[in-house]
Amino acid sequence: MQVKWLARALANLTEEADYIAKESPANAKAFFMHVLASVEQLKEHPHLGRAGRVTGTRELVITHYPYIVPYRVRNSSIEILRVFHKARAWPKHL
């Protein structure tokens, strides 16, 4: 399956990495690469994440970091919807 990142999901990931980079550019790069690698696993295991809070979605919990990546499995692709820190309030809309 193909992974498609929505623009707002990429923006979320970049914003989070930029925030981490203020303290440690090396940690920011490690975080960014870890999220990308985690999401790549969905190509082979699209239902790896838990059932999502929003109907029709799933949530990939990022190991070693307090982040969740909500996504949607389509017929031939996986849509990455957002990247959220676990401590933040969940938005009404993805």
Regions found by a protein language model. Give the residues of each.
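Basic, Lys/Arg-enriched alpha-helical interface segments
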Residues: Q2-T57, R74-S77, H93
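Conserved strand-loop elements at the edges of beta-sheets that form or border functional pockets
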Residues: A7, I62-H64
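Conserved catalytic core of Hanks-type protein kinase domains
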Residues: Q41-L42, T63, V83
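Short hydrophobic/aromatic beta-strand or adjacent loop that forms the aromatic wall/cage
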Residues: T57, P66-I68
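Enriched for short, Lys/Arg-rich terminal
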Residues: I68, R72-L94
